[in-house]
Each structure stands twice: as C-alpha cells, then as structure tokens.
Amino acid sequence: MKLFGSSGIRGIVNTEVTPELALKVGLVLGSRKKTAVIGRDPRVSAPMIEHALVAGLTAAGCDVTKAGMVTTPTLAYAARKYECGVMVTASHNPSEYVGIKLWNPDGMAFDSAQQEEIEEAIEKENFSRVTWDLIGKIAEDENAIRDHMDMIEGLVGKSKLRVVLDCGCGAGSTITPYLLQELGCEIITLNSQPDGHFPARNPEPNDQNLSLLKKAVVAFGADLGIAHDGDADRMMAVDEKGNFVSGDELLAIFGRFECGDKKGSVVVPVDTSLMVDDYLEGSEIIRTRVGDVYVAEGIKQCKAIYGGEPSGSWIFPKISYCPDGIYAAAKLVEIVNEKKLSELRAELPIYATKRGALPCANEKKAEFMKRAKSKLEPLGKVLDIDGIRVELENGWVLVRPSGTEAKVRITAEARENVDGIYEMAEKIVKEALK
C-alpha cells in the first residue's frame, strides 16, 4: 500500500484522503509514539482530518497537543518538544486537496523507512487501542506561533523596509505580517486573512499567480514583495521593480549569504540551474532527487550549510530541517536592507533554459529510461538519482519521466547554444522511445 509521496500523504479530500485513513494513521502513529503535536492549515477539510487523527492518536494512548491553525514550519519547530509532529496540509495544492505530513523532533520529515513502516502497519492493521484509563490526553499549545517568532527574531536583524506581503489566504497570515512588523518593517498585506477556499489566487506562489503582488509592489513604492503558499513552507519574492524573482535566483542569493566565506556544502535538486554552481563558486554543490524531503535528507547526511528547491522551499539546518518560509522571509528582508533585490539579481549569471516533453506510456517508462541512459552516457558525466542528468562542457540536460502524465520531460540549460543541446537530447530521446 503506497500512501506517501514526496510531500507526505496528499490527495482529494473524501476520495483519496478520508477521515477513515486519518484515523488509521493516528492509530499507527499513536501505537509507536507517546507524545505528538498537531497543527493544520486553513483549508476547509483540515479540521475534519485533524479530529480523525487526534481520535486515532489518543485511542492508541498517545498524548496530543493541538497547536491550532499554524504554518508547517511553525508546527515542525514545535515538534522539538514532542516525539513527533503531525501537520494537516496540502501545501500549495488547491482547496479540494488535503494531506498529512509527519515530522521528527529535529524538523526532518519522516523518511522513507518511517513512511514504509506506517504504510505496512496500516495495511496489516498493526496498531493497538488502549483501555479507557490509558487513553491519551489532549492539550493545547497557545504559544507555538510566539515561540517560532521569538526564535527567528533572535537570529535576524531589524530593518525599516516597506514590504508588500501576499499570504495567499494561507496559514502564513497567522505569523509573517506580525513577525515582519516586529522586525521594524512597514507592512502592506494582500490576501492575509486565512480562508480555506483560497479565493484570491491559487496557493502556489509562482510568477503566474502573483500578478497582483507585482503590481502592488510598484504601486506602493515598496522595497520588496513576499508571497507564501497555503502552509508557508514556501516563500517567493518580487523585487522593487515588480519583477518576479525565480527560485534559482533566490536559491543562489540565500546560498551566498549562508555560506559567506566558509564555502561549505549546498544541497539542491537535480533540476537546479547552473547559475547556482557558478555564483557559489568554491562551495560544494550536491544534487538530490526532486522534493524538499530529499534535499533535507541530503543536508543532514552531508552536514551542509544550506539547501533548497527552486519551487520555493528554503532549508536552513541551523534552525530546522523543515523548509521555513517564515524565516526565509525575515532573512530576505535582512539581506535586501543592505542591497536592493534588483541589484543582487543583476550580479547573477543568467543562462538559457529550454524545456519540452514527449509522449511515453507509463508502463513503458522504465524500459525507456534504460535505453535512454545507455545512449546519453557517452555524452558526459551522468547522475541518475532522479531521471538522467548529463553534465556537458557547456551545460546540462535532464531526461525525466513525468510523475503525473504519460510523458517524458526534457530540460536543457546552457551557457550558450541551448537550442543545440536541447535538439541533441531530443533526438536521443526519440530514438530511445522507438
């Protein structure tokens, strides 16, 4: 039984993720942990799933503390005082989705082995219910948000920037506006009232969904625009000219400030731009599978200084292995207080990228990847942890099966002549598809 993806358990509410499933997750977890803290994002279905989880946890004898509506990084930080953390969220997915994400006390999401143990236990109904006198107690933590804010304020300096903040009607509304105000910023808020219908925009903070933020930054003469997804584990930005800042650019900028003169290791997924390698020259760039869980695991294994994903997940291991969009927002404000974001972007090398896809039946993907690898290997150094990435003298190409569609995706990036690299890769892929 496969329940967990790269972002925990996630699916359409009452179809793929049901109260019955949540009850079983709670029973399995409660049979193995004595204490847990649970939180939820604003989506309409979250209280229902939370109640089912709490019922399962306490029925198995686990004491549960409810943190209420909080961001995922707030919940992951609160987990340090318990044996595990449980977050009800579907992150950047639309309203009809709901999910369950599980956290260790160090802020690391449950790893593959822990996930498989839960899946197997649910399938075999390997859990226990305690007698009435051993049922777990339920308490509330009213200080989870304050504790998270205090931790960040102890690490980040103050500034007087004017910031437009778009929380996307998500859980970030409960913390980021107040944190940035306490750090001295003048805050102009957009969509910063929690609403699980996400009426203002799609929760994913990408260029397409942030048109209002881009206009507002210019209209208000702001120094910076910041946006979150539904649970604020992600953070994206707009510069003072109203331009969306790409994830690769933010990854590089944060990396420069985190590494400083230490030139340590930085962990990124396989589809990250060469910009990061070149801008962070002297630092070791380690690549993992796509997914913030895998980036976090890589950071922990390599004792890296920093890591992140261009999708907007920034991981600072000095505070947690959970992507923390709240800390990232405060840190970016501190950085931009010293130098305009547009000026920081101007320092970055920009390379051309080209993407495409070709049809490939799902049942043929495994065999296709074998053939593609044999044809791509002569071109350069191959990294095959997530698709096939080939390092070329002037760039790289990544061939990766889609996880959601009957397609294989091709991505090419080059310091020059990206069309030539892409066409070469496309020709090889077409041959491997025959």
From Swiss-Prot:
It is an enzyme of class 5 (isomerase). Mg(2+) binds at residues 91, 229, 231, 233. Its cofactor is Mg(2+). The active site is at residue 91. It comes from the Archaea. Its EC number is 5.4.2.10. InterPro entries: A-D-PHexomutase_a/b/a-I, A-D-PHexomutase_a/b/a-I/II/III, A-D-PHexomutase_a/b/a-II, A-D-PHexomutase_a/b/a-III, A-D-PHexomutase_C, A-D-PHexomutase_C_sf, A-D-PHexomutase_CS, Alpha-D-phosphohexomutase_SF. SUPFAM superfamilies: Phosphoglucomutase, C-terminal domain, Phosphoglucomutase, first 3 domains. Pfam families: PGM_PMM_I, PGM_PMM_II, PGM_PMM_III, PGM_PMM_IV. Binds 1 Mg(2+) ion per subunit. Activated by phosphorylation. One of its GO terms (molecular function) is magnesium ion binding. One of its GO terms (biological process) is carbohydrate metabolic process. Keywords: Isomerase, Magnesium, Metal-binding, Phosphoprotein. Belongs to the phosphohexose mutase family. PANTHER family: PHOSPHOMANNOMUTASE. This is Probable phosphoglucosamine mutase. It comes from Methanosarcina mazei (strain ATCC BAA-159 / DSM 3647 / Goe1 / Go1 / JCM 11833 / OCM 88) (Methanosarcina frisia).
